Amino acid sequence: MDTYFNTGGRYNPGTDSWTATSINNAPEGRSSHTAVWAGSEMIVWGGSATIFSLFNTGGKYNPNTDSWTATSITNAPAARFAHTAVWTGSEMIVWGGNDGNSGVNTGGRYNPITDGWIATTTVNAPDGRDGHKAVWTGSEMIVWGGIDFNGFFSNTGGRYNLGTDSWTATSNSNVPDPRTAHTAVWTGSEMIVWAGFNGFIGGFLNTGGRYNPGMDSWTSTSMTNVPDSRSLHTAVWTGSQMIVWGGDGQPGALNTGGSYCAQGGPTPTPTPTASPTPTSTPTPTATATPTATPTPTARATPTPGSRPTPPPRP
C-alpha cells in the first residue's frame, strides 16, 4: 500500500545541508499537489492520497518560524489533483486538474494575507484538463497541454488575465503536438514547452515550441543536439537558457539533460587589420587582432534512456 507523506525538508546549498520541516499542523500527506513561493512562505494546495481521497485543503509554511498555517476552505475550489498553480506577486492561482472523474476547467485565486478565495471565470476558459502546465507572465497566466476531460492528449491552451478575470485562447497555428507530462518555463517574453508524453504518436517526445503571447504565435524548438525523448522531467529558466534534466524515457529513468538557448547572438564581425604606415624610418604599425563575439549555441549530450513507461496517474 502506498504511503503519502506530509514531511519535507529545507536544503541550504551554501552549507550543503538539510533541515526537516515541522509536521505540527502540517497538511495531510498527499501527492500530485502544487506549491508556490509567496515571498516569505511556501503555499501547498490540493492533491490526492488515493483516487477516492482528494483534497481542497492546503497550508502555508513559514521557514523562518518552521511553522504551518492552514489555508481557508471557504470558497476554495473543489478538491482535485494534477492541477497547476502560479504565484502572481500577491495571489496564488490554481487551475484545472482532475476531480476523480475527469479534467476540470475551474480554478481559484488565493490571497494569503486575507486567507480568502475568489473563483476564476469559466467563460471562454480552456477545456477541462489535468497534467497540463502553467506559467505566470507578469500579467497573465498561460496554461497549455495536458489530458482533456474526454481523456485525449491536448495541444490547446489559454491566457488568463488577472485584472479582467477573462480568458483568451492560445493560437493553434504551428502549435506543438498534443502532450502531457511536459515542462513549461517563462523567459520574460515567451513560454517554452518541451518534451512530454503522447501515447498516440510514439510515446515519449523531445519536441517543443516557444509561444509568444504578444504575437499569439508559436515557433518550434530546434532538434539539433536535442536531448533524448522523455516525460516527467524538470526544467528551469536561468535568465538566458532553459535547462532540462532527468525524466522517464526509453528504456527507463534518465539522468541526462540539456540547455536550450531560445535566441542566438549576432554574427561575429572581425575587426579589419590595420595597414603599416611608412615613415622616414620604416616601422610597421602593429596589426590589430580581429575580435569576434561568439554566438551562443545550445548543446546537450543525449544518453539513451530505458523502458517506455507512460507517465503515472494517481
PLM region descriptions:
Residues 265-313:
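Ser/Thr-rich, Proline-interspersed low-complexity disordered segments
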Residues 1-268:
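Kelch-like beta-propeller repeat domains
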